[in-house]
Each structure stands twice: as structure tokens, then as C-alpha cells.
Regions:
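Catalytic nucleophile loop
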Residues: 2-28
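Acidic/charged, solvent-exposed loop-and-adjacent secondary-structure segments enriched in E/D, K/R, S/T
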Residues: 31
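Amide-donor transfer/coupling interface in amidating biosynthetic enzymes
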Residues: 1-7, 34-152
Length: 152
């Protein structure tokens, strides 16, 4: 995270990565979602034998060229989540229970791609708008960053 801050490189935080982004910038986490939210929506199974589950995630702001309220079904597997959002981050996607599922830096000029998602895009079905668009925008920003570094 220190490297990303110093060099303003593209950063995609997945699951715990989103949680690290939030805590690094001063936010807090729910320590155990079933106790806090009263739901097992985000991780199926028992505490000793958990497994992936799926649920919907919807955008609450325009992001990555997607319209407001774009929804995808994503793979989820976590028992912690954002409680207090860090200063400098903004929420762009949420689960039906209100848990924050997508964040980005507020300063998109300094950090063109500093985005975290609580779900697992690498295990979610292709063709889901949030999954596809997050990946495509990350790759686009990474290629632009590589071009900037190569021209130095």
C-alpha cells in the first residue's frame, strides 16, 4: 500500500485487499458479519467448513461506465467487511444487506484506479457487468501506467 501511495499505481483490492485498503486509510471493519448483520449471506457453511456463496451486488454511483443500479451476481467468501469507511474512499457498490462491496479513492485524478471489491471476480461468472467492467478498467489503467514507465 505504501508503494501504491508513493507511485500512484493502479491497485485492485479483492476481498481482504478491499479490507486492507480501508484499514490502511483509517477505516474499520466488522469483526464477524454474522454477529453484526445477522446474516450468513457472505460466506456459506459452518465456521470450520466454510465455502463460497453467491449474492447480488449493485452500484450506487456511476462507475466504470455502468449505469446506477447495475447489478451482478458475484462469488463471496468472507466473514469480515467494512464498518466505517476510511476518509478518502467512496462507496460505489453494495450488497442487498447494505454491506459495502465496492470502494474507490475519491481523488480519481491522483489515483485513476484505486478500487476494491469485497467479492471474488476471479471466481465469479464472466458476463456479469460489475465483474467484467472492473477487470477491463484495471487492465486499461495498468497498461497506461506501463506506458508511462516505459517512456521515462
Amino acid at each position: 500500500m505504501l508503494w501504491v501511495e508513493a507511485h500512484q499505481t493502479p491497485c485492485l483490492g479483492i476481498c481482504r485487499g478491499l479490507q486492507w485498503m480501508n484499514v490502511f486509510l483509517g477505516g474499520t471493519l466488522h469483526p464477524h458479519l454474522p454477529d453484526e448483520l445477522g446474516t450468513h449471506m457472505h460466506r456459506a457453511g459452518s465456521p470450520t467448513h466454510s465455502r463460497d456463496t453467491t449474492h447480488s451486488v449493485s452500484t450506487i454511483s456511476d462507475q466504470f461506465g455502468m449505469d446506477l443500479s447495475t447489478t451482478s451476481v458475484v462469488v463471496s467468501h468472507h466473514h469480515q467487511g467494512i464498518d466505517a469507511l476510511a476518509p478518502g474512499l467512496t462507496t460505489w457498490a453494495v450488497a442487498p444487506d447494505g454491506l459495502i462491496e465496492g470502494v474507490r479513492r475519491t481523488d480519481t485524478l491522483k489515483f485513476p484506479f484505486y478500487t476494491g471489491v469485497q467479492w471474488h471476480p476471479e471466481r465469479s461468472a464472466a458476463g456479469q457487468p460489475l465483474v467484467d467492467q472492473v477487470g477491463l478498467h484495471f487492465l486499461r489503467c495498468a497498461r497506461m501506467q506501463r506506458g508511462k514507465l516505459a517512456s521515462r
